[in-house]
From Swiss-Prot:
The keyword Transferase applies. Its EC number is 2.5.1.61. The lineage of its organism: Bacteria, Pseudomonadati, Pseudomonadota, Alphaproteobacteria, Rickettsiales. Belongs to the HMBS family. It comes from the Bacteria. Pathway: Porphyrin-containing compound metabolism; protoporphyrin-IX biosynthesis; coproporphyrinogen-III from 5-aminolevulinate: step 2/4. This is Porphobilinogen deaminase. HAMAP family: Porphobil_deam. Tetrapolymerization of the monopyrrole PBG into the hydroxymethylbilane pre-uroporphyrinogen in several discrete steps. The modification S-(dipyrrolylmethanemethyl)cysteine is found at C236. GO terms for cellular component: cytoplasm. It catalyses: 4 porphobilinogen + H2O = hydroxymethylbilane + 4 NH4(+). It comes from Wolbachia sp. subsp. Drosophila simulans (strain wRi). The keyword Transferase applies.
Length: 292
């Protein structure tokens, strides 16, 4: 059986697609798998502000189109790039084991975020990061930074930059990290650190394959986070964050953040994994009511 996996062409995206390929081959050694690189709008406008050109869905739109046209069988995405609502007719039956959901501070000049001098310049284009950085250090000067991970790492004109730790691990760049930021300083993006695999909702054969390699603990955790995002109708324009962590085999601890331009709000709660989705929705309703 030939399976075509669609992915963006960036180095990180290809590494993630290869990870998914290996997981499939470990479980189904007789599969023949082809990686298909697809250029997305997010790649074409690599230096533009995502919120201004249409949001993070630009990283998956063209890949979803290839899925819907039956040109590929499945698509591998960074889950944090998948918007709250994606194309009708598609589903995500699989999330691979999640790596660190944390953000990392990288600096060639300073030892930590806290030790930065007054008015230091930090580069990041994520509004979620900007809001939380200024909540931690209101004096900081936050400037935009776009491009792939390699491009961002090459830019040394700032006091520091913020990147996802998981991406650096996958690219074997973890040694460049100055400081891993704890959730109390920088709560992560929904799904950060997780790779998801998307396919057609009616493709039973592919769904069966993907369910075999799904990491159920990661799947349930990110389901709670995405439920929060859907409830607040979050997008690239919305400063939001959520992180679900296991406190026991069957209990999740969820922390969420939502900002409205004036204030930043946090909430937390714990529930059994069976109620993960409801917990995310309840958190979303609470914070949404505060932002009205």
């Amino acid at each position: 059986m030939l399976v075509k996996i669609g992915t963006r062409g960036s180095k990180l995206a290809v590494v993630q697609a290869l990870e998914a390929k290996q997981k499939l081959l470990d479980s189904f050694p007789n599969l023949s798998i082809e990686i298909v690189k697809i250029k997305t709008s997010g790649d074409k406008y690599a230096n533009a502000n995502l919120a201004e050109i249409g949001g993070k869905g630009l990283f998956i739109k063209e890949i979803e189109a290839e899925l819907l046209e039956n040109n590929i069988d499945m698509a591998v995405h960074s889950l944090k790039d998948v918007p709250a609502f994606f194309s009708w007719g598609l589903t995500i039956p699989c999330v691979l084991e999640r790596l660190s959901p944390c953000d990392a501070f990288i600096s060639h000049k300073h030892n930590s975020l806290e030790s930065l001098p007054q008015q230091a310049t930090i580069a990041t284009s994520a509004i979620r990061r900007k809001v939380q950085l200024l909540n931690f250090r209101p004096d900081l000067n936050i400037v935009p930074l776009r491009g792939n991970v390699t491009t961002r790492l090459q830019n040394q004109s700032f006091d520091g930059i913020i990147l996802a730790e998981a991406g650096l691990i996958r690219l074997e760049k973890h040694h460049l990290i100055t400081e891993v930021l704890p959730p109390k300083v920088m709560l992560s993006a929904v799904g950060q650190g997780a790779i998801c695999i998307q396919c057609r909702r009616n493709d039973v054969k592919i769904i069966d394959l993907l369910e075999k390699i799904n990491n159920n603990m990661s799947f349930i955790g990110v389901k709670s986070e995405r439920s929060f995002m859907k409830t607040v109708n979050g997008s690239c324009f919305t400063p939001l964050a959520a992180l679900a962590e296991y406190v026991s085999e069957n209990m999740l601890y969820l922390r969420c953040m939502l900002a409205d331009g004036k204030n930043i709000y946090f909430t937390e709660r714990t529930s059994f994994i069976e109620d993960a989705e409801k917990m995310g929705m309840d958190a979303g309703l609470e914070l949404k009511s505060k932002c009205l």
